[in-house]
């Protein structure tokens, strides 16, 4: 396995819509493993392919068991709230909970920043797994939040797009300053 280079905002690639994956080859599975290793190395709980420079509809997620939720979501029977790793190829959310909850989010592509984002507390997602099998996952809590966050990336959106224009613009400006500071340090 190999570590992949992380794309940091501002970068136009992060605002592109990712393309569907035609099929799962052994080469694609190596890429999935590399994504997961990169996510772990960077301390994340989710990663989208576009964040490592590949415009394909792929995300990996691994939410630690027992990760605290910052509010009291409904307990959805039959839904998973943590666990993994999950490999989502061509994921599609087919159902959103009507219950919206706030929680602080961060992003590997916007380092050193966290903002409160309001999202549905549960989703049902259809996807292909690591073996190319079609699956359906009912997720709530941090798992649902992470899936939604990563799927925003596949649609060319960053989580800060859920903020007011003022907060969004400040977050992007701060990201540019952080990226510049990190590149000067290298």
Swiss-Prot record:
It catalyses: N-terminal N-formyl-L-methionyl-[peptide] + H2O = N-terminal L-methionyl-[peptide] + formate. Fe cation binds at residues 107, 149, 153. Coiled coil: none annotated. Transmembrane segments: none annotated. Pfam families: Pep_deformylase. The keyword Lyase does not apply. Its EC number is 3.5.1.88. GO terms for biological process: translation. Gene3D superfamilies: Peptide deformylase. SUPFAM superfamilies: Peptide deformylase. GO terms for molecular function: metal ion binding; peptide deformylase activity. InterPro entries: Peptide_deformylase (IPR023635), Peptide_deformylase_sf (IPR036821). Binds 1 Fe(2+) ion. Disulfide bonds: none annotated. Keywords: Hydrolase, Iron, Metal-binding, Protein biosynthesis. It comes from the Bacteria. The active site is at residue 150. Removes the formyl group from the N-terminal Met of newly synthesized proteins. Requires at least a dipeptide for an efficient rate of reaction. N-terminal L-methionine is a prerequisite for activity but the enzyme has broad specificity at other positions. Belongs to the polypeptide deformylase family. This is Peptide deformylase. It comes from Neorickettsia sennetsu (strain ATCC VR-367 / Miyayama) (Ehrlichia sennetsu). The gene is def.
């Amino acid at each position: 396995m190999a570590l992949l280079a992380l794309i940091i905002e501002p970068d136009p690639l992060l605002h592109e819509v990712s393309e569907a994956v035609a099929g799962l080859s052994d080469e694609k599975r190596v890429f999935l493993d590399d994504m997961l290793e990169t996510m772990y190395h960077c301390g994340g709980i989710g990663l989208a392919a576009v964040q490592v420079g590949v415009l394909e509809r792929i995300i990996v997620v691994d939410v630690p068991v027992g990760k605290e939720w910052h509010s009291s979501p409904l307990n959805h029977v039959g839904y998973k709230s943590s666990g993994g790793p999950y490999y989502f190829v061509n994921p599609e959310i087919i159902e959103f909970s009507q219950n919206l909850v706030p929680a602080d989010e961060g992003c590997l592509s916007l380092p050193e920043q966290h903002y409160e984002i309001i999202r549905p507390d549960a989703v049902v997602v259809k996807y292909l797994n690591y073996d190319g099998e079609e699956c359906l996952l009912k997720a709530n809590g941090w798992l649902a939040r992470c899936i939604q966050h990563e799927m925003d990336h596949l649609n060319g959106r960053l989580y800060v797009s859920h903020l007011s224009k003022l907060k969004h613009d400040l977050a992007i400006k701060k990201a540019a300053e952080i990226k510049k500071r990190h590149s000067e340090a290298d």
